[in-house]
Design a protein with these regions (language model features):
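Rossmann-like NAD(P)(H) cofactor-binding subdomain of soluble oxidoreductases
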Residues: 110-112, 124-136, 140-174
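NAD(P)+-binding Rossmann beta1-loop-alpha1 motif at the extreme N-terminus of oxidoreductases
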Residues: 1-114, 119-122, 126
Length: 174
């Protein structure tokens, strides 16, 4: 008899299996929260840009400034596993950004492309240096190497960085 058919292991496996729907709900809720963060940040940027937009001869804000701020809003997502890919799909589904305004990278590009329906950029540095807001959905044990890789790009482009890493303080992330 194989050891994995032991009744105690079966109970443990069943308990873990029973938690899967709850875990999926938590992932969806986390993604909805991050979508809300992205949308609020986009609105605040948009309102600041419109407030300082040049006015035409009638005193109206220039519409080109409005569309320019929309097209310049780029969301970078590094890490497109369960949470990252769900987040990207929700961003598009809720029309927070257009698909061409999202740049993604992943350790598994083919899976990320399949899950998100977007082209995957191989360079985390490229994403970090060209986005307005950067969402980080990497596993904690990858963070040290990953952070060294993008440190200079973030300091140069100054995106808003949002991390879903558990167990890391803001001070450590900086």
């Amino acid at each position: 008899i194989p050891p994995w058919t032991d009744s105690s292991l079966d109970k443990q496996t069943k308990r873990i299996h029973d938690q899967v729907p709850l875990t999926r709900k938590c992932i969806v809720n986390q993604c909805l929260f991050w979508c809300d963060v992205a949308q609020r940040f986009k609105r605040s940027l948009h309102s600041k840009r419109v407030a300082v937009a040049p006015q035409d001869s009638d005193g109206n804000n220039n519409q080109n400034a409005q569309s320019s701020s929309e097209s310049n809003f780029i969301v970078g997502v590094i890490g497109c596993g369960s949470v990252g890919s769900k987040f990207v799909r929700e961003l598009v589904k809720r029309d927070i950004v257009k698909p061409n305004q999202i740049k993604i990278s992943s350790r598994t590009p083919s899976r990320a492309k399949q899950r998100c329906g977007l082209e995957v950029i191989q360079s985390n540095v490229e994403i970090a240096s060209h986005c307005t807001i950067l969402f980080i959905f990497v596993l904690p044990f990858h963070f040290r190497n990953f952070s060294r890789e993008i440190r200079d790009a973030i300091q140069g482009s100054r995106p808003l960085v949002v991390s879903s890493l558990a167990g890391f303080t803001q001070m450590y992330l900086q």
